[in-house]
Amino acid sequence: MYQVRRPSRSEFRPVRGLSYHLRVWGEPDPQTPPLVLVHGWMDVSASWQFMVDALSRDRWIIAPDWRGFGLTRHEGPAVDSYWFPDYLGDLDALLDQIAPDRPMDLVGHSMGGNVATIYAGVRPARVRRLVNLEGFGMPATRAAQAPGRYAQWLDEIRDCRQGTKGLQTYDDVQGVARRLMKTNPRLPADKAQWLASQWAAPDADGRWVILGDAAHKVVSAYLYRADEAVAVYERITAPALSVIASDDSLALWWKDRYTLADYQERIRHIPQLQETALPDCGHMLHHDQPVELAQRVEAFLAGA
């Protein structure tokens, strides 16, 4: 089993009608801005542990479980779909609690990188430095796709209500670990075993279930507007670092519908942008190369 170097503690905060779970390392320091880490889709805050362990020094770090993931819980009725603006609202409300008068360093991976980058453009005064780890956004869309997208959304929320969009369950934690290693062949067994115990939990019948709401699998009713994203990027005032993996995830997922060149054309609208690529890693670059990533992130955050 992986041996954690910097143990975290759990805190729960009321955020917009939810009980939000935060994984926290270190203590507040008036001389250092808080470091906020936001995870990707179908992930949890524990995903950051390997990078946190690789940092050269302690600092106050806060990593939330997004709504519908990990230990964050709705306090009202269940939902049948999720909306991207709610992540922005949750982050804004959370920061008002933990650091109301201080800009923060913000690091996001995948969906979390997309949320973090949009937030940095919408609330530029709240972000001191921004790191986007493969937060690509989505392929550009056309207005003509809207009718079909709405119909798809209606079909999928019906499926969700009928219980046909459930997540796979596993016999034991070892089964979850095998699933993680199948998805990411670079993930060693000790890390997979540790992550599995954070990413899933046994249900009342003893089956291990992913700590994620199946409603996250429902497509967004709204089309992704690349031009809107670019308009937000142009308003970012913080220095920003875009980190990509040596493996081309976009080519794997989208083929020629959305390419790395397309992403780079968009992200370069951020006024103060640096770009870097990590060797020998895939989309889960904070698992594959935590030491190298920690070094690059720390160097960037320490910049003048």
Locations of the language-model features?
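Active-site glycine-rich loops that stabilize anionic/oxyanionic intermediates
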Residues: 40-43, 110
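Catalytic histidine-centered segment of alpha/beta-hydrolase-like enzymes
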Residues: 278-290
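Conserved alpha/beta-hydrolase catalytic His-Asp/Glu region
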Residues: 164-223
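Conserved hydrolase catalytic core segment
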Residues: 101-146
